[in-house]
């Protein structure tokens, strides 16, 4: 039986311009750690940048694309071109997604990967949607307390070094996608990435900034430093980098499929390095990894159908709960980012994230997970009814049920097949450990290291997500495909940014459906975020007017202004009258290419 325990906020309206803002400031670099070229120190907390009538649209032309027949969007222009070339040569959307993902593993090493994992939602031309889970798993020797010291305090072992890595799923995921839905020969999809790794590619400004920002971590591991910080000097924009060992690893995948990674020389290299560095991944862990096909969640919003990921992704649940709780709220009639708009959505997110953090995990380990109850409209209506005109204390928000870094790509082909694929190392540059030219993930931090203790994203999670051998850690990745009321493909979207993926994806969807924006504006408009704990509303520059800030504080909210890439990087494709519009987030450095 569902019982209400308390809850929250709303009312008060303040007008707010719906023009889009200037671009957010760049992310702050990390502190110097002996890198030869100076590394800029972290800046002090930013002063609030409020929205004004002068705030204008900022949609970078190079990050927009239009195509009458197909569209590819990713976070790296070189990878986007690889995907577009595959489509132009007769491949389908899945082929393009696979080739783009492998290219991202070379040219976008902070998140693109062989040593990580992710999720994909695919809608075939007939309209049927499927979901693939290639999330990493805990090694067989993992234990629930493996990251606690003798006093029971969490250590940094879940974030840095060999013990931070889960068993990678990315290669198995690409192999499974191709086996079920691919069209072109496998080798043709891997070859472009091999060429980029073997022949080299030019480091762009964004990658150079990322290398410099994360140089202290990369310098901890010789195999990472020699590629990205040679002689303790971060690779500069305009320089060319080739990664011969990565080319060899990709050649094995080209020739042997998934077995070329999970068995043989590459697997042996991973197991050997893990043992030498105190990691837990073994050859048996690698050989036993399997990607899992799952039934996507389907939720309704304003006459649209949203197809998104089920657990162990939490993104689909939170997106679905948000849609259900906002069913009766006419967001499009509210001043955009005025008090009532922000307040209503924040309160919905607080409830949805509370359920996410406490109840969700790997369905193979968490029995009787209440997915259906969490998405049931009567339950969501009761939750929505508890929202009041002022903020409810976080202690009074609980699930009322008994019982940077990631990267995303979106593809649509000429038949209407669509792919939203999100893959990750967890934080930027993962564990910092490079094996055979590719970085390993630090996804073990996405487990509950200690109930009640926050992870690197500030998420405070429960025992449902505790570490267990072979278990998939809970994720916030939210690849989503949207159909209109006629059942026609309308929107493909996904993002990067930890738990902010969920709120960034939601705001992109809402901007299109509720406010009728173009896809470029929907992505560029500034964002806000709340994840239940820590209990603050995070505000992007030029997101709200000063009067709205004042009303939020008066209603009991802690308001935190944040700069940089903290609000996620989304990519999306929107159907328009004469084809497809694609947009890469101006917070990142991606590209959209169509034809």
Which residues does each PLM region occupy?
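Alpha-helical support elements that line or immediately flank enzyme active sites
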Residues: 86-87, 172-180, 256-263, 268, ...
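Short, small/polar residue-rich loop motifs at catalytic or cofactor-binding pockets
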Residues: 293, 403-406, 475-477
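Extended C-terminal subregions enriched in glycine
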Residues: 470-472, 505-506, 514-564
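Bacterial signal peptide processing site
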Residues: 16-19
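Active-site rim segments in enzyme catalytic domains, especially the processed small/beta chain
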Residues: 106-131, 280-282, 417-485, 515, ...
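Sec-dependent bacterial lipoprotein signal peptides
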Residues: 1-14
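Internal maturation/activation junctions in enzymes
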Residues: 50, 328-424, 435, 451-452, ...
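Noncatalytic scaffold domains of N-terminal-nucleophile
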Residues: 38-81, 93-94, 98-257, 261-263, ...
């Amino acid at each position: 039986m569902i019982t209400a325990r308390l809850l929250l906020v709303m009312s008060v309206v303040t007008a707010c311009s719906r023009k889009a803002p200037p671009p957010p400031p760049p992310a702050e670099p990390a502190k110097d750690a002996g890198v030869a070229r100076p590394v800029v120190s972290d800046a002090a907390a930013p002063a609030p940048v409020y929205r004004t009538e002068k705030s204008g649209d900022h949609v970078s032309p190079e990050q927009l694309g239009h195509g009458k027949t197909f569209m590819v969007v990713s976070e790296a222009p070189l990878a986007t071109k690889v995907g577009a070339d595959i489509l132009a040569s007769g491949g389908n959307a899945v082929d393009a997604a696979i080739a783009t993902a492998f290219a991202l593993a070379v040219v976008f090493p902070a998140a693109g990967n062989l040593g990580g994992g992710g999720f994909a939602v695919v809608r075939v031309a007939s309209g049927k949607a499927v979901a693939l889970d290639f999330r990493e798993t805990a090694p067989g020797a993992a234990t629930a307390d493996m990251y606690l010291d003798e006093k029971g305090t969490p250590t940094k072992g879940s974030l840095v070094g060999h013990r931070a890595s889960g068993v990678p799923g990315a290669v198995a995921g690409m192999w499974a996608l191709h086996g079920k839905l691919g069209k072109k020969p496998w080798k043709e999809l891997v070859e472009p990435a091999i060429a980029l790794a073997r022949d080299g590619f030019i480091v762009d400004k964004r990658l150079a900034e990322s290398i410099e920002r994360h140089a202290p971590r990369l310098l901890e591991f010789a195999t990472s430093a020699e590629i990205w910080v040679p002689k303790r000097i971060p690779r500069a924009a305009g320089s060319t980098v080739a990664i011969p060992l990565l080319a060899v690893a990709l050649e094995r995948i080209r020739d042997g499929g998934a077995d070329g990674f999970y068995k043989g020389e590459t697997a042996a290299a991973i197991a050997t390095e893990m043992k030498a560095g105190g990691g837990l991944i073994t050859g048996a862990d690698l050989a036993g990894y399997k990607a899992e096909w799952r039934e996507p969640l389907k939720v309704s919003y304003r006459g649209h159908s949203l197809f998104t990921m089920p657990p162990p992704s939490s993104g689909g649940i939170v997106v679905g709960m948000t849609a259900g709780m906002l069913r009766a709220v006419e967001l499009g009639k509210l001043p955009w980012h005025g008090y009532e708009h922000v307040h209503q959505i924040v309160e919905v997110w607080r409830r949805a994230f509370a359920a996410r953090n406490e109840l969700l995990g790997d369905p193979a380990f968490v029995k009787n997970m209440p997915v259906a109850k969490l998405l049931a409209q009567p339950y969501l209506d009761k939750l929505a009814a508890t929202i009041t005109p002022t903020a409810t204390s976080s202690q009074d928000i609980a699930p009322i049920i008994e019982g940077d870094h990631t990267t995303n790509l979106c593809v649509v082909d000429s038949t209407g097949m669509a792919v939203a694929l999100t893959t990750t190392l967890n934080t930027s540059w993962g564990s910092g450990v490079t094996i055979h030219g590719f970085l390993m993930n630090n996804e073990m931090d996405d487990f509950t290291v200690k109930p009640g203790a926050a992870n690197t994203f500030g998420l405070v999670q429960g025992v449902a997500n505790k570490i267990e051998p072979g278990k998939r850690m809970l994720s916030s990745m939210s690849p989503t495909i949207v159909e209109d009321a006629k059942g026609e493909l309308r929107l493909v979207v996904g993002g990067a940014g930890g738990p902010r993926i969920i709120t960034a994806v939601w705001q992109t969807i809402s901007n299109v459906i509720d406010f009728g924006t173009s896809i470029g504006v929907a992505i560029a408009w500034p964002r806000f975020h709340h994840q239940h704990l820590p209990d603050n509303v995070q505000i992007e520059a030029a997101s709200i007017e000063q009067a709205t800030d004042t009303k939020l504080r008066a209603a009991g909210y802690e308001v935190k202004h944040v700069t940089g890439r903290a609000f996620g990087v989304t990519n999306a494709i929107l159907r328009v009258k004469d084809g497809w519009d694609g947009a890469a987030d101006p917070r990142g450095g991606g590209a959209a290419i169509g034809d």
